[in-house]
Design a protein with these regions (language model features):
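Bacterial N-terminal signal peptides that target proteins for export
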Residues: 1-12
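Membrane-spanning beta-strands of outer-membrane beta-barrel proteins
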Residues: 86, 131, 181, 234-236, ...
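C-terminal segment of classical bacterial N-terminal signal peptides
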Residues: 16-25
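Outer membrane beta-barrel
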Residues: 29-63, 67, 72-213, 231-238, ...
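Detector for outer-membrane/organellar transmembrane beta-barrel domains
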Residues: 239, 244-372, 384
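Outer-membrane beta-barrel "beta-signal"
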Residues: 384-386, 408-420
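Transmembrane beta-strand segments that form the barrel wall of outer-membrane beta-barrel proteins
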Residues: 105-116, 205-209, 256-262, 345-354, ...
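Outer-membrane beta-barrel translocator domains and adjoining extracellular loop/strand segments
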Residues: 55-60, 119-129, 160-167, 213-229, ...
Length: 420
């Protein structure tokens, strides 16, 4: 009890200090406890003022804009809106302990931002974003091997585009090759290269909860809420290899990921009386590769994925329900950036996601034409950065083809970031 009560007290005081105090904390403030435990506080404050021409679909209009809304949802005249968004703002609490079993030390992390329930309607409600948990996990590590249990990124969440506006929802997230999501699960991280080796190699393995939309009215009841991935009775499995090397003139990293999961297209319960009744589990799979290369002041990075029924991982332009999400397709993005000075840099981004519309019609003849059939995203960022402060002017454009025709939306944003 003596350890637990001070820990919670310090956590509360630290949260008030970081989020509402008059003075700025130093980067990654560390609080030490008497028993050797430490608490590291990190995060950032992020604010965006933006002008949209045309509407974005599904996620939102501000820091979570990703692809254009359908033609029928677009205004034909008076298309402009001016708004602000602070929901990217994030706080992270990481507790570290001394070794408890030989060289093995536990660590616990809780991270949250303000993209909670999307129900803040104007006036007033949209100025009161709600908290949500991003990460909540506990590690046990000896330095080279880490066992993680809790909610964290799936290994498919790999390379991330640079932006000052699109952070919690990265550039092209769910709209280009930028895929992956957070799930509760069991994660294993194992260093394969020797300590100090010029080329570092790491293996990641993950078994995560199944995921997908509810398949029946029974499964979608408020007290049930069981998706077709959970109803399969099987986890999602992923394996990833990371490679990295750094020299005085060149740094690079690369990774490759494999994914498999199952979805019960009839939900919980199954007809066992009909002749020939079979299991209704649908297999889903995917592969992904990404890389980052930095020769001097220049950066080039991106990733590519191909898979089937990966909507719960934000693939296939984030489509999960039509045809039970039985969609094949691929996506890719690339971004180039150059640091002209220690403070100024310019970044350019392009990405696309292309579901296989013909294969979908062949595999799902009664599902109708696939709603979102193709998406292209483009982004340009001029960034000024000095220490923990950064400000940027960003232009984002999305062109999305629906089964009802093409649509587009544009965003110009001024964003500021202060790293705690």
């Amino acid at each position: 009890m003596r350890t637990r009560i001070p820990s919670l007290s310090v956590l509360a005081v630290a949260a008030v200090f970081v989020l509402g105090g008059a003075r700025a904390a130093t980067a990654q403030q560390v609080v030490k406890f008497g028993d050797g435990q430490t608490l590291t506080i990190s995060g950032f404050i992020n604010a965006t003022m933006f002008y949209d021409h045309g509407l974005f679909g599904s996620f939102g209009q501000g820091q979570n804009a990703e692809f254009a809304a359908a033609p029928g949802a677009q205004p034909t005249t008076d298309k402009g809106i001016f708004d602000g968004d602070v929901r990217n703002t994030r706080i992270n609490f990481t507790f570290n302990s001394t070794p408890v079993i030989g060289k093995w030390s536990p660590r616990a992390t809780l991270e949250a931002d303000f993209f909670g329930a999307f129900n803040g309607v104007p006036p007033f409600g949209d100025e009161q974003p709600q908290f949500r948990i991003r990460f909540a996990f506990v590690d046990l590590s000896n330095g080279r091997t880490t066992l993680r249990i809790g909610q964290y990124w799936s290994p498919m969440f790999g390379e991330v585009p640079v932006s000052l506006t699109h952070l919690a929802f990265p550039l092209g997230y769910g709209a280009t090759g930028m895929v992956g999501w957070r799930f509760p699960g069991v994660f294993l991280y194992q260093d394969l290269s020797a300590a100090g080796a010029p080329l570092t190699v790491q293996l990641q393995l993950a078994a995560m909860k199944g995921s997908g939309p509810a398949a029946t009215a029974r499964d979608s009841a408020a007290a049930v809420n069981v998706g077709n991935g959970e109803a399969s009775g099987l986890p999602q499995f992923e394996a990833r290899l990371n490679f990295a090397k750094k020299t005085p003139k060149l740094s690079w990293s690369a990774y490759v990921v494999g994914h498999v999961d199952w979805k019960d297209t009839t939900g919980t319960g199954r007809d066992t009386t009909s002749t020939g009744a079979q299991d209704s589990n649908m297999s889903a799979w995917g592969v992904e590769a990404g890389a980052n290369i930095q020769p001097g002041s220049f950066t080039l990075h991106g990733n590519f994925y191909y898979g089937k029924a990966l909507g719960q991982q934000f693939a296939h332009i984030t489509q999960t329900t039509q045809g039970h999400g039985d969609i094949r397709g691929w996506g890719a993005w690339a971004q180039a950036g150059y640091d002209f000075t220690p403070h100024w840099s310019l970044w350019a981004y392009a990405g696309m996601d292309q579901p296989d519309v013909q294969r979908f019609a062949q595999d799902n003849p009664t599902a109708g034409a696939l709603a979102r059939q193709l998406n292209h995203d483009y982004d340009a960022l001029l960034r000024f950065r000095a220490g923990r402060y950064a400000v940027g002017l960003e232009y984002f454009r999305s062109v999305t083809r629906y089964n009802t025709g093409p649509a587009s939306a544009d965003q110009v944003a001024l964003s500021v970031l202060y790293t705690l």
